[in-house]
Amino acid sequence: ITYTHISSNNYRINVTLYRDCNDGKLDNQGGGSSTSQGSYLTEAFIRTTTTNCQNKNIGSISLTKTGFENITPICDLNKSACGNNPTYPYGIEAHYYTGTINFDSYTQYNGCGFHIFIHQATRNEDINTLATEEEDLYNYVYINPWLENKSSPSFINPPNVLYNFNQPVRSGDYVSHNNNDSIVYKWSAPQKSHNSNIQYKTNYSAQQFISTYCPSGTNCTANPSSNPPQGLYLNSKTGDYSFTPTSLNQTSTRVIE
């Protein structure tokens, strides 16, 4: 979720949902052979974030779907699981939604920060590193329009979510920003509702969301310079990460903050 400053206290909210094309469709749209239907996304919600500001839901933002695209990282997208001639077993789509909010309608909360959030009924059923299956999907962006009017950082490229077994991964989740902000990257726990984290299975965590190569077994110190990369490394200043996946058919959750 990101936001774009339009004028005065008017903002556009931008939401992207990433869909596994082997799973249900979104809003009756998407490629692949699945006939099941996923959740419809029609609105985002607004809540204050501190006790002094009552820490509660205060409204909603209507969302309009603007389109979707196949972002599977292969040369012939039509051969992905999202395409019409699927010979590759995987496929990922990005589905885009937007809405607008005028914070002049919330002047009774002047000085308060807000979470703009979405809440969906279920996650992908194939995720196998979380302690409980098919928990709710909750995600948010923080904004305080009373301090200054500006746009949030935005991601430059779609996330890399498909990794090859025993092949080194050197990638990154990069953002652009024009406000001279200091950007820090970190991995955080997925959430199912406000301040309610989803637990990972034993040996997994937000910082170890996937099985990775470690010469000594598990929980080794990350070393991005080794060949292959050891552990799970994230550069908090640049967004670069590296690891070597060591489990077949593993589906996990990575939250970048």
Regions found by a protein language model. Name each.
Residues 1-257:
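Long, compositionally biased, intrinsically disordered segments
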